[in-house]
């Protein structure tokens, strides 16, 4: 029975999410809250931590793979490799630290550079620590305006209260799924066009 279960899990669709943002904005806290329903305030940064979880997305069982990358400059050189493997990105900043919001533009540029061959990259801008409203440095209008300029969704979250934590991960998975479906459609369209052409060519040769 266990073998069957393992097999079915192995055949589930896998969506790869990368957490991106400056150090201390709460990327790990958001990830751990989503994974384990726990709020972890102090978390030692590493190069990257990977998590995998089975979830139900719009009635379909899927797996989400979350790579939580460190925001520190020391790790900038290895970030490119992580970005290449990602299918969607949560670009996180803290609403209490304007500098972390400013840094999102640079992180986005890095993602676009690494994924230059792709048309539309699934990405959400996330303003974390919404529970600390009294310490807000980034106005909602400013963050929303930047997200609109980039053509992406802006959501405010709190890893502490769990506000919108599920929303950002599930919304991003929906974007990843839509992109995959669109790519498969294009691929199948090209394939059928190719086979029609080769059939035509064969007919001509005969």
Swiss-Prot record:
Keywords linked to the UniProt accession: Apoptosis, Cell cycle, Cell division, Cell membrane, GTP-binding, Hydrolase, Lipoprotein, Membrane, Methylation, Nucleotide-binding, Prenylation
Subcellular location: Cell membrane; Midbody
Catalysed transformations (reactions): GTP + H2O = GDP + phosphate + H(+)
Region span, Disordered: 181-206
GO molecular function terms noted in the UniProt entry: ATPase binding; G protein activity; GDP binding; GTP binding; GTPase activity; ubiquitin protein ligase binding
Keyword tRNA-binding among record annotations: no
Record note on modification: Prenylation is essential for membrane localization.
Gene Ontology annotations of biological process type: apoptotic process; cell division; cellular response to exogenous dsRNA; cellular response to starvation; positive regulation of autophagosome assembly; positive regulation of epidermal growth factor receptor signaling pathway; Ras protein signal transduction; receptor internalization
Residues cleaved off as propeptide: 204-206
Membrane topology: Lipid-anchor
Residue numbers covered by motif Effector region: 43-51
Regulation: Alternates between an inactive form bound to GDP and an active form bound to GTP. Activated by a guanine nucleotide-exchange factor (GEF) and inactivated by a GTPase-activating protein (GAP).
EC number: 3.6.5.2
Top class in the EC scheme: hydrolase
Sites where the protein binds GTP: 21-29, 68-72, 128-131, 158-160
Chief localisation class: membrane
Modified residue annotations for Cysteine methyl ester: 203
Lipid group attachment sites (S-geranylgeranyl cysteine): 203
GO cellular component: cytosol; midbody; plasma membrane
One Pfam family cited in the UniProt record for this chain: Ras
Cleaved signal peptide residues: none
Function (record text): Multifunctional GTPase involved in a variety of cellular processes including gene expression, cell migration, cell proliferation, oncogenic transformation and membrane trafficking. Accomplishes its multiple functions by interacting with distinct downstream effectors. Acts as a GTP sensor for GTP-dependent exocytosis of dense core vesicles. Required both to stabilize the assembly of the exocyst complex and to localize functional exocyst complexes to the leading edge of migrating cells. Required for suppression of apoptosis.
Family (UniProt): Belongs to the small GTPase superfamily. Ras family.
Protein name: Ras-related protein Ral-B
Naturally occurring in which organism (per UniProt): Rattus norvegicus (Rat)
């Amino acid at each position: 029975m266990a073998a069957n279960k393992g097999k079915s899990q192995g055949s589930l669709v896998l969506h790869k999410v990368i957490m991106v943002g400056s150090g201390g904005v709460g990327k790990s806290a958001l990830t751990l809250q989503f994974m384990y329903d726990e709020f972890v305030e102090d978390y030692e940064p590493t190069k990257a931590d990977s998590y995998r979880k089975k979830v139900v997305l719009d009635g379909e069982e899927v797996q989400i793979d979350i790579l939580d990358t460190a925001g520190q400059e020391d790790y900038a050189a290895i970030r490119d490799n992580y970005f290449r493997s990602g299918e969607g990105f949560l670009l996180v900043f803290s609403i209490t630290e304007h500098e972390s919001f400013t840094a999102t533009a640079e992180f986005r540029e890095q993602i676009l550079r690494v994924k230059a061959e792709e048309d539309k990259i699934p990405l959400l801008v996330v303003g974390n620590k919404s529970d600390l409203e009294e310490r807000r440095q980034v106005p909602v209008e400013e963050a929303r305006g930047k997200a609109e300029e980039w053509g992406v969704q802006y959501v405010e979250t709190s890893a502490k209260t769990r506000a919108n934590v599920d929303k950002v991960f599930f919304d991003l998975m929906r974007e990843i799924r839509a992109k995959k479906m669109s790519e498969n459609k294009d691929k199948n369209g090209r394939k059928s066009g190719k086979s029609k052409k080769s059939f035509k060519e064969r007919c001509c040769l005969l």
